[in-house]
């Protein structure tokens, strides 16, 4: 998917067959109706360094190098971040 000009980027560190990852990505997509941001999904199993770093923490949402949440969607934290960058 093409990036939206001027949109913030939320990176989701994920892995295949991770229902928590799927749930978190779906929750982020619902916020795209209120905020302009792109979602980049990175498979941690595609890179040994990422797998070592994130291991069992997935899913992890990061923005500008800062972790916003892991395991489950923290809508308050993500919304607070997105409101500061409007």
Locate each region found by the language model.
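Local sequence-structure signature of Cys/Sec-based thiol-disulfide redox active-site neighborhoods
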Residues: 2-30
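Short helix-capping segments at alpha-helix termini
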Residues: 32-36
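Thiol-based oxidoreductase modules, predominantly thioredoxin-like and allied folds used
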Residues: 37-48
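Surface-exposed interaction regions that form or flank ligand-binding interfaces
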Residues: 54
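A short, hydrophobic beta-strand/beta-hairpin element that forms part of a small beta-sheet core
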Residues: 58-67
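N-terminal, polar/charged subdomain of small-to-medium soluble alpha/beta proteins
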Residues: 67, 72-74
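Thiol-/selenol-based redox modules, centered on thioredoxin-like
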Residues: 78-86
């Amino acid at each position: 998917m093409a990036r939206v000009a001027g949109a913030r980027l939320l990176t989701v560190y994920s892995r295949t067959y991770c229902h928590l990852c799927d749930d978190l990505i779906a929750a982020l997509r619902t916020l795209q109706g209120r905020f302009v941001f792109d979602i980049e999904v990175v498979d941690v199993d595609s890179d040994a360094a990422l797998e070592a770093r994130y291991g069992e923490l997935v899913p992890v949402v990061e923005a500008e190098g800062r972790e916003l949440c892991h395991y489950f969607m923290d809508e308050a934290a993500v919304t607070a971040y997105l409101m500061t960058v409007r």
